[in-house]
Amino acid sequence: MKSPAPAHMWNLVLFLPSLLAVLPTTTAEKNGIDIYSLTVDSRVSSRFAHTVVTSRVVNRADAVQEATFQVELPRKAFITNFSMIIDGVTYPGVVKEKAEAQKQYSAAVGRGESAGIVKTTGRQTEKFEVSVNVAPGSKITFELIYQELLQRRLGMYELLLKVRPQQLVKHLQMDIYIFEPQGISILETESTFMTPELANALTTSQNKTKAHIRFKPTLSQQQKSQSEQDTVLNGDFIVRYDVNRSDSGGSIQIEEGYFVHHFAPENLPTMSKNVIFVIDKSGSMSGKKIQQTREALVKILKDLSPQDQFNLIEFSGEANQWKQSLVQATEENLNKAVNYASRIRAHGGTNINNAVLLAVELLDRSNQAELLPSKSVSLIILLTDGDPTVGETNPTIIQNNVREAINGQYSLFCLGFGFDVNYPFLEKMALDNGGLARRIYEDSDSALQLQDFYHEVANPLLSSVAFEYPSDAVEEVTRYKFQHHFKGSEMVVAGKLQDQGPDVLLAKVSGQMHMQNITFQTEASVAQQEKEFKSPKYIFHNFMERLWALLTIQQQLEQRISASGAELEALEAQVLNLSLKYNFVTPLTHMVVTKPEGQEQFQVAEKPVEVGDGMQRLPLAAQAHPFRPPVRGSKLMTVLKGSRSQIPRLGDAVRASRQYIPPGFPGPPGPPGFPAPPGPPGFPAPPGPPLASGSDFSLQPSYERMLSLPSVAAQYPADPHLVVTEKSKESTIPEESPNPDHPQVPTITLPLPGSSVDQLCVDILHSEKPMKLFVDPSQGLEVTGKYENTGFSWLEVTIQKPHLQVHATPERLVVTRGRKNTEYKWKKTLFSVLPGLKMTMNMMGLLQLSGPDKVTIGLLSLDDPQRGLMLLLNDTQHFSNNVKGELGQFYRDIVWEPPVEPDNTKRTVKVQGVDYLATRELKLSYQEGFPGAEISCWTVEI
């Protein structure tokens, strides 16, 4: 047989909680493997996502080439089908019981074949990989199908695609169809690779219950330039949405004899919390970890409600409490707690047992003394980065101690910081005690991850929630009791309708809320609901049954973590039966992929599970070097076909050091820190529907469907009195070149609509405190910043509708949408379409916020941290007459006096009763980005 040419890999990675697709490949001209068609079809119905990825490749080389197909999945997504079509012959993947598949796997390994499918994990992801040799001129079609129930987090559902084909693809198309009978309340898209040309390939259509998003770029739109054959498709494509909700008992949807019940009441008062933060300050937390923990804890403390009670416990070898009992979240107590948290230093061992038991003891004492408010929610939030090393170190004994101490009274949430944390230990301890575990990835955004987790549990609305259905109507119902419901999340119950059940399904949801018990009721007509799901365009039929099966499997796998003996055996038998019946790859099943004769005959896909060292377990023949989870937007590691050598796993030595960094991976990047801005006074309720509903459903460009923003009423203090001095020749503003005649860069250039002057430039001489630069209640806009020496050390833009905040430093951008924080790096392309607002960033580092009838705000990073940031403005004619602020005042009825003779380079400008001296000068303007342009403007100083 002819030997294959050097291995070539093309990757397709998809992730959906999200839906993520990464498509790295090399060009056909260099390697012969050409992707001539790539399609992604994702259909979301009732939060259940069914994704089909189809890729067609051809070998245009004169020799055999190897193509490798990779798919990266979220942990909670299940592969349900995979096939390869080679020369008209279909080679399917077959789901089998784990033991049966293992026999074929072992036999293949015995023949010297690399039968395992290589998997590594990123942030909550798993990788699926299949390789196959492709003869010259031959074509091959790969098709992968996987399914997932999207979870609502911080008020939104999210689908994410990473697109990186690394070559031009003749037919590239992504279609996302969403059907939500409740009605789509908000729809957003975001991309990190979109150019103005590619934006024309994106279309979005939406009516009351349906949305269709299509991305279909031509070859020319994919090109970096006319002279280059490289593609610009290299980044993320994200869709976020939410649905309409009523104050009733939720929404019941029925299809083909199965039902799903979604319940997420929003307009309820928040229950008071009793929360204890248990913070690991052992030696392994030193450096960046403890710095980010302090930063996050300070911001979390400031988010506590006055009705909450709290305390802090820091632990290393010993556990120390901040106060002897829980204290009210008054301004005075919060300031003291912030001061205490800011001084936490890392040293010593890790005594998890004593720390958590001390937290339980504090709650018990307050409970016995009747100091905890009636119908309040008690939470313990544990943050640690490793195994227990001091005191009780046996994980099982610690879990038993904690479970017995809590005894169902409180909820424990465990946050595992870093790659080597014993996550299964924390997960079991949390699930045993009515909470959940979350891994915090060690990266530049770790503090944001901590804040986002807290925001998920910050607003409890209900506790002791129970769903109830008539016994003659339903059977085989999934979990129907929940300890808590938090604002921004959703409870989901699914089940099967009985054959001779009633025509109307009744449901009752009961729970405890602030100061009282409450019961919700809802009903659904079986016939009417069945009719809703007859549309063939948006629905993959029989999806409700698969939704029920998937949710049942996920919940039983979660129960399996805490089960033992006969209960464990029964759960595993149920999971196995459902997995085989519905063709799901789960921890108890494998998918066996066969190949053409003459190649490796078998590859086996299995669902990875976390083991005691926190790493994902891989097939023995497929273990690879440790994988450092990528930051969103960074390029995933490429694993070549020839690199499947077995590398020892990280073991006890790694965990003992607790500061180990795998060879070849630098420590997490990031600035040494950035000034913390003052928090905003608060945010309004979530915005309403972003797009007009109607009967028309034609495809229209996304940017054409943005709506203007309504007025936002607000009260702001009067403008401060500003003192103007004549411009000094020893200006502290740096020059662009050593040439003293070169134009200087002003702090900000203010385009004045309809003004007879050229332009107005404003230099800020000194600012000890953050400045309110613009406050425009009618625009729903506020811009604040801190000016230091030669530039802004930080700038913050707050927009009321849609609710958005951008906090910028020279090192990074943090965008807060609702309660979710997302980090972006400068000079990474960004294109985000929100209701009534567009947010874009180009490769030069110019971020712009724009919208119909809105002032365009630009933020520009000047590369040099000492020079800071620049604030740019356009479309200033949209400022209202109510605009205020240090710079906003220049847009309110200013009066220019005639220039002063004899050289006409000085004049007076009157602003709000104050005279300013303006000097005519040449300046370097970055209004249009780099490299800047020389302008003549009248300069004033404040």
From Swiss-Prot:
- Mind listing the UniProt keywords for this protein, alphabetically? Acute phase, Coiled coil, Disulfide bond, Glycoprotein, Protease inhibitor, Secreted, Serine protease inhibitor, Signal
User: Tissue-wise, where is it found?
Assistant: Highly expressed in liver. Weak expression in lung and heart.
| Gene assigned in the entry | Itih4
**Locations of Pro residues compositional bias?**
663-690
The UniProt family comment states: Belongs to the ITIH family.
For the region Disordered, give the residue spans: 658-698, 726-745
VWFA domain sequence ranges: 274-457
TM annotation in the entry: none
What terms describe the molecular function in GO for this protein?
A: serine-type endopeptidase inhibitor activity
Please give the CDD domains that the UniProt record associates with this protein. vWA_interalpha_trypsin_inhibitor (cd01461)
Report which residue ranges the record marks as coiled coil: 552-586
Signal peptide coordinates: 1-28
Q: Which residues are glycosylated?
A: 81, 517, 577, 732, 874
Disulfide-bonded cysteine pairs: these are 761-937
* Pfam families listed in its UniProt record: ITI_HC_C, VIT, VWA
Provide the species name: Mus musculus
Q: What is this protein called?
A: Inter alpha-trypsin inhibitor, heavy chain 4
